[in-house]
């Protein structure tokens, strides 16, 4: 592959800088040269991405040299996090920019640098030599999607490469389209909506769907059975996760100190809130499915977020009746505690004190202090609902758990605590 002039290298970096991919200070730092060695033949990224068995590269195991512009960078152990991506993404110079129906090969490639490898700055054009592989390896993976990557053994800077451009995307790519766009820059267009935030505080992901409404559970709309299965399949085709640029579990170790990617006080990411993309993302498979990956790690660096989130919590609807019914998830309110169960351990807080029972018969608070804290918050919240009837979820049934004989023991205790706060006789429970 022959790149152009040095002036084009600077132009390419400036283009990436304008897209928000490259800090302005990097845009002019493109003067190093990495000339190809005599006899060296560069393999186009699209050839490396040619599909062989399954969705794996046909060149798995081969040692190749290729040229590409760095579009995303994920240094090892950034911000002290352990499970970082440890590499960078490159894309064929001058590629992208338009959606091409019928595309069969990607022009993007993930370069694995390991924990101590060099991570070039985004916007840099590089010549990389390494071994082609899949992550996870075909023999080890238990999922249908893997990431084609190049395990780098040498890297040099090339001058004169035209910057790649993000491809506009108004919907979630189909599986075949995603394979042909793997590791390439996309620029999602229009409004997207948060349809799931269950793993946001653990793995930093938000599940999005194009349009202005979240996806609904199948049996909210259709009858159980084949119709529901078909509906869920259609939902799956319209959903994609926005990742945070790391594989770190944010609920463990020092990662608990890292700022969340898409959550902040006063700026929630509720289901139904709208998302607009302000920066390109990389489309890549992680943990068995394709995701939108930011071009830099957002965990610990929320200012790098590629999206803005807007929304307003809907108010209570106006109805004709005067009886107010509410539902409340008490999140494993167990009056039987982990500390009282032989052999039970717990999940620790930042001080190391066990807060929640871990893999025990009981599933709630571990200590009396933790239970008192949980109970106080539940009591305050329920009494503030102004409800006449409250249906509870995740409250202990000691008989089912195998630690007691009174099915309603925890329910009775909670009602007692509610009445102590609201006044005797305010609440009663249905046995």
Where do the model's predicted regions map?
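Secretory targeting and sorting signals
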Residues: 1-29
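Intrinsically disordered, low-complexity serine/threonine-rich segments
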Residues: 10, 34-36, 403
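Active-site surface patch of divalent metal-dependent phosphodiester/phosphate bond hydrolases
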Residues: 368-431
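Conserved SGNH/GDSL esterase-like catalytic core that processes O-acyl groups on lipids
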Residues: 354-372
């Amino acid at each position: 592959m022959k790149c152009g002039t040095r002036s084009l290298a600077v132009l390419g970096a400036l283009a990436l800088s304008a897209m928000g991919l490259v800090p302005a200070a990097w845009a002019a730092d493109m003067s190093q040269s990495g000339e190809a060695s005599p006899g060296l033949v560069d393999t186009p990224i699209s050839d490396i991405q040619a599909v062989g068995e399954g969705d794996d590269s046909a060149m798995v195991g081969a040692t190749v040299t290729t040229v590409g512009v760095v579009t995303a960078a994920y240094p090892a152990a950034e911000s002290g996090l352990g499970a970082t991506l440890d590499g960078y993404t490159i894309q064929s110079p001058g590629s992208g920019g338009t959606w091409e129906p019928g595309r069969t090969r990607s022009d993007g490639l993930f370069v694995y640098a390991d924990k101590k490898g060099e991570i070039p700055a985004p916007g840099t054009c590089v010549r990389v030599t390494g071994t082609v592989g899949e992550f996870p390896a075909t023999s080890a993976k238990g999922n249908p999607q893997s990431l084609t990557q190049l395990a780098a053994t040498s890297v040099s800077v090339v001058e004169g490469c035209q910057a790649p451009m993000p491809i506009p995307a108004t919907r979630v790519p189909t599986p075949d389209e995603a394979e042909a766009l793997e590791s390439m820059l996309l620029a999602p267009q229009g409004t997207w909506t948060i349809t799931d935030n269950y793993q946001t505080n653990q793995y930093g992901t938000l599940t999005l769907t194009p349009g202005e409404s979240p996806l609904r559970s199948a049996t909210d709309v259709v009858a159980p059975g084949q119709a529901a299965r078909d509906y869920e399949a259609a939902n799956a085709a319209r959903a994609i996760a926005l990742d945070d640029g790391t594989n770190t579990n944010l609920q463990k170790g020092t990662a608990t100190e890292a700022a969340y990617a898409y959550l902040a006080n006063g700026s929630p990411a509720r289901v139904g809130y709208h998302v607009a993309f302000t920066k390109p993302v990389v489309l890549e498979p992680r943990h068995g499915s394709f995701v939108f990956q930011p071009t830099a790690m957002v965990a610990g660096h929320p200012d790098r977020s590629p999206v803005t989130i807007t929304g307003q919590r809907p108010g209570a609807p106006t109805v004709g009746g005067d009886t107010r019914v509410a539902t409340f998830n008490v999140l494993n309110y167990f009056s039987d505690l982990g500390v009282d169960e032989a052999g039970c351990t717990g999940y620790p807080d930042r001080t190391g004190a066990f807060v929640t029972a871990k893999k025990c018969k009981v599933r709630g608070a571990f200590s009396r202090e933790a239970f008192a804290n949980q109970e106080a918050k539940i009591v305050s919240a329920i009494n503030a609902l102004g409800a006449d009837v409250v249906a509870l979820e995740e409250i202990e049934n000691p008989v089912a758990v195998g630690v007691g004989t009174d099915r309603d023991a925890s329910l009775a205790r909670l009602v007692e605590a509610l009445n102590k706060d609201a006044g005797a006789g305010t609440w009663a429970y249905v046995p």
